[in-house]
Amino acid sequence: MYLAQIKAELQEAADVLDKFMSDEKNIQLIQDAALLISNSFKQGGKVLSCGNGGSHCDAMHFAEELTGRYRENRPGYPAIAISDVSHLSCVSNDFGYEYVFSRYLEAVGQKGDVLFGLSTSGNSKNVLNAIKVAKEKGMKVIAMTGKDGGQMAGLADVEIRVPHFRYADRTQEIHIKVIHILMMLIEFEMAKQA
């Protein structure tokens, strides 16, 4: 009944991944992002992650695998997903949703920390505001975007962009793959110092 559609969906997902992988720059950027985060941890820094909708879930997933574990039993790494419901509702009510992430960074972000911001469009106002505050505080910024990078293009120290223009879900599929690779590389890199 739906076999052709299922195969078409899987094929499109594979095609987007193949296109992403065929650009060597993307492979280098993933390594750069992993080293940036690992170096922050080695210097006593932390990573703060944020995004909206599915990207918010990916930001939480990234943080929990840093504080918990990915594949290896090892010490937890300092990571916070900006996802506290009381904070989000307070700032949304008192200042506006576009400030939910930047306000948190104003409170806890420090020089040497890393902001890991996700936006499939690259145009999420609250992530853009977080990038601005992170830069003002001397933090490093990793952006995971899609399409043409949107307004986030060129703002991050490392931008990993999935140049897919049809649907956000294809971009998110690559984002979660990249997150898992980052976890693997961070565990490799941090094990060197253990």
Curated annotation (Swiss-Prot):
Q: What is its EC number?
A: 5.3.1.28
Q: Establish whether keyword Cytoplasm is in the entry.
A: yes
- SUPFAM superfamilies (UniProt xref): SIS domain
Residues binding substrate are: 52-54, 65, 93-94, 119-121, 124, 172
What does the cofactor field's note say? Binds 1 zinc ion per subunit.
The record's Pfam families line, in alphabetical order, gives: SIS_2
InterPro entries given in the database record: GmhA/DiaA (IPR035461), Phosphoheptose_Isoase (IPR004515), SIS_dom (IPR001347), SIS_dom_sf (IPR046348), SIS_GmhA/DiaA_subfam (IPR050099)
UniProt domain SIS: residue ranges: 37-194
Q: Which residues form a coiled coil?
A: none
Q: Which residues does the record give as Zn(2+) binding sites?
A: 61, 65, 172, 180
Keywords noted in UniProt:
Carbohydrate metabolism, Cytoplasm, Isomerase, Metal-binding, Zinc
Which cofactors?
Answer: Zn(2+)
Please state where this protein is localized.
Cytoplasm
Example of a GO cellular component annotation carried by this entry: cytoplasm
Which NCBIfam families does its entry note? gmhA (TIGR00441), PRK00414.1 (NF001628)
List, alphabetically, the PANTHER family matched: PHOSPHOHEPTOSE ISOMERASE, SEDOHEPTULOSE 7-PHOSPHATE ISOMERASE / DNAA INITIATOR-ASSOCIATING FACTOR FOR REPLICATION INITIATION
Subunit annotation: Homotetramer.
Q: What is the name attached to this protein's record?
A: Phosphoheptose isomerase
